[in-house]
């Protein structure tokens, strides 16, 4: 499992005994440690253990978080365990928070690929169907979702419109459990995502 992760520990971790919040990044192209460090310096985020899934790793998010919990001093409250992802890994992060809120309670989902590997339109999106079929949504979790307006991301607006309607119909409220943001000028690429991760983490932190 070690080969599947790159770990950045907060200052003083190795000589201390306190537990810390966790940020697990499922896309190694996101400079999550740098962005989290900047937000920490601004007082937005607490000191966090930042773990990045290695490129090419086939380990699932649930496996990685379970390993991290048993290996590092991570806070027990699930709201202190965050995830972020892009495209298909954003869909993975969203699923984990909804299906295993005991493992992770926050997720920043950038350019979520609701169409899946099969490229399904909104009406046939497997992830949207899963959401519609749920009898209830977990409480105490928060999801940040965004999509751009250029290239592939331009096609994501109807998916996000539908997911917003589903979440509201099941009792969630905008800016309480979730936020959906249309990132003007945003696109489906790492340069755009790294500019959008900060605002996502800031919202998850309540700032």
Residue ranges of predicted features:
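Non-catalytic cap/lid and distal C-terminal segments of serine-dependent acyl enzymes
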Residues: 1-207
């Amino acid at each position: 499992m070690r080969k599947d992760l790159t770990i950045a520990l907060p200052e003083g971790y190795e000589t201390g005994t306190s537990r810390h919040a966790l940020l697990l990044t499922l896309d190694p192209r996101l400079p999550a440690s740098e962005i989290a460090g900047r937000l920490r310096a601004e007082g937005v985020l607490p000191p966090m253990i930042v773990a990045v899934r290695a490129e090419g790793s086939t380990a699932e998010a649930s496996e990685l978080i379970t390993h991290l919990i048993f290996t590092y001093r991570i806070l027990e409250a699930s709201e202190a365990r965050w995830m972020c992802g892009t495209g298909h890994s954003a869909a993975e992060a969203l699923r984990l928070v909804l299906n295993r809120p005991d493992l992770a309670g926050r997720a920043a989902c950038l350019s979520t690929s609701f169409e899946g590997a099969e490229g399904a339109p909104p009406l046939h999106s497997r992830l949207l169907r899963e959401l519609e079929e749920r009898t209830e949504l977990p409480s105490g979790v928060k999801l940040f979702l965004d999509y751009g307006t250029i290239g592939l991301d331009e096609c994501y607006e109807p998916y996000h419109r539908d997911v917003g309607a589903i979440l509201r119909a099941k009792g969630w409220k905008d800016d309480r459990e979730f936020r959906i943001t249309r990132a003007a000028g945003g696109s489906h690429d790492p340069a755009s995502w790294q500019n959008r991760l900060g605002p996502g983490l800031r919202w998850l932190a309540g700032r």
